[in-house]
Curated annotation (Swiss-Prot):
Organism: Dechloromonas aromatica (strain RCB)
Basic and acidic residues bias spans: 127-149
Molecular function per GO: RNA binding
Disordered: annotated span: 121-149
Protein name as it appears in the record: SsrA-binding protein
NCBIfam families linked: PRK05422.1, smpB
Keywords linked to the UniProt accession: Cytoplasm, RNA-binding
Family classification: Belongs to the SmpB family.
GO CC field: cytosol
Role noted for this protein: Required for rescue of stalled ribosomes mediated by trans-translation. Binds to transfer-messenger RNA (tmRNA), required for stable association of tmRNA with ribosomes. tmRNA and SmpB together mimic tRNA shape, replacing the anticodon stem-loop with SmpB. tmRNA is encoded by the ssrA gene; the 2 termini fold to resemble tRNA(Ala) and it encodes a 'tag peptide', a short internal open reading frame. During trans-translation Ala-aminoacylated tmRNA acts like a tRNA, entering the A-site of stalled ribosomes, displacing the stalled mRNA.
Length: 149
């Protein structure tokens, strides 16, 4: 079940591979995510010391959250993947010029998972071409719908 989708990532990048990663979260963050109080639009993944970290994901604390814990809505969160997956991703990002972008936040058996994509950036003309393709498909669907009436 998807919690939130980063639509901007598909607009700005060509996503070539997808990986599912766990996230190291605190209790108040899990409650806030379950309530839908997060944003992954401006977030990105970095590699530091052979580990992956999610930066810029904003989680707003609930009003009923604990007062004795300091809440940092945009703290850096560690991503949890298998060592083989991490080494493969590090190799591609460092050599081939790929970027790691968060695509989707969802539940798997009660656990919160983040789908990250191995992606290459789109140029402005690529974005325009994609927009034209979407428009033509939309027009074709509209014409088919009108024809059936």
């Amino acid at each position: 079940m998807s919690i939130t989708v980063n639509k901007k990532a598909f607009h700005d990048y060509f996503v070539e591979e997808k990986y599912e990663a766990g996230i190291s979260l605190e209790g108040w963050e899990v409650k806030a995510i379950r309530a839908g109080r997060m944003n992954i639009k401006e977030s990105y993944v970095i590699i530091k010391g052979g580990e992956l970290f999610l930066i810029g994901m904003h989680i707003s604390p609930l009003a009923t959250a604990s007062t004795h814990v300091s809440h940092d809505p945009t703290r850096t969160r560690k991503l949890l993947l298998h060592a083989k997956e991490i080494s493969k991703l590090i190799g591609k990002v460092e050599r081939a010029g790929y970027a790691l972008v968060p695509l989707d936040l969802h539940f798997v058996r009660g656990r919160i998972k983040l789908e990250i994509g191995l992606a290459k950036g789109k140029k402005q003309h690529d974005k325009r071409a994609d927009e034209l393709d979407k428009d033509s498909k939309r027009e074709a669907q509209r014409a088919m719908k009108e024809r059936q009436r």
